[in-house]
Amino acid sequence: SIRTMHDRSNGLGGGFAGYGIYPEYADYYAFHVFYDTQAAKEECEREIERHFDIVNLSKIPTRRHPRITDAPMIWRYFVTPLPTKLAASQLEEREFTSRFVIRINHTLNGAYIFSSGKNMGVFKANGFPEDVGEYYMLENYEAYSWTCHGRYPTNTPGWWGGAHPFALLDTTVVHNGEISSYDANRRFIEMFGFSCDLLTDTEVITYIIDYLGRKLGMTYSEIANVIAAPFWSTIEKQEPKERERLTYLRNAFASLMVTGP
């Protein structure tokens, strides 16, 4: 169905996220990883083995495609945190895993964990989304929900890691347009342990949703009221309790409002 939107993208990034695709490994985090070099792969695998029990690893199956080129090495790992490492960290399991993913993506040159949730996975590449689906042989996966996207980058480069969906743990984001609030959003979110390294504004939106939802416990409705805050004129027309709630969200999280075309 994404083929009907071919002209909405320009071939500089396409991808899919499928939920429910790994029922046999539903209790394990599925790391999908791009590697630019063998050295990066070996170093990243050493880091994974130091912090996680790897129950299965393999190349992600792909087929040769004339319009998908310059592919990195693409591997998949089903993992669970090592009990000793998790206990020593004094972190909740999801926080332990998200910090590991962010650290690898920030510090390990040539390795990028682009999917890290449970019973779900992201498949993306530098190409049109319908070609990406063929490249990853997505007809072999069954999911209860899919998201997909085709990029038309203007201010940011087209590359494998910059394609959508963007993901952290189970959250995936697709986004159209450029956001003028990127730098304000980035400066705020990086105060809480996130690091924006992947050359596109959608990355910061993913981290905002993770921060507000997973860390602060907001509902998706509340998150929407932060990142797409109502106009003040709209807030003023609400009943007193709702007006107070929306005013608090807009004032307390002003730096997380996402604005732009």
Where are these regions (language model features)?
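Conserved short alpha-helical segments that host acidic/polar catalytic motifs at enzyme active sites
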Residues: 1-261
